[in-house]
Amino acid sequence: MKSRDALSRLKRFDVEEKRRKVAEIESLIGDFNQMASDLDRQIAIEQERAGVYDTNHYAYPTFAKAAIQRRDNLLASVADLETKLASARETLAEAFEELKRIELLEERDAERMKIEQARAAELGAVSGLPHRVAS
């Protein structure tokens, strides 16, 4: 019984750790998307300032070119993080299912123990002697 309690605690810890990992990845995706939209605004401002919107034009602002490259890198990172997020969510779901299975086993054991204690109490009442249940 104690080993199952330890296993249950371990599984709960595992689920919480995986939940933190999912939250961390979601936070990174949000941050990267925010940075990309900030860069989009900066690119638009720089294009407006220079009056050149064609990236292949010789007078296109160097800052805007660099910002476009950074934005593209951020968006590529977001795409990579989204695949990692899907994988992390899948492992979280698996860990959660495992935890639920362990908790169901614990509930079944607790119910079995109650039944055994009730039987022991009945036997003790019938025989007039206290009856002990092995725990």
Regions found by a protein language model. Give the residues of each.
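Charge-rich amphipathic alpha-helical interaction elements
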Residues: 1-135
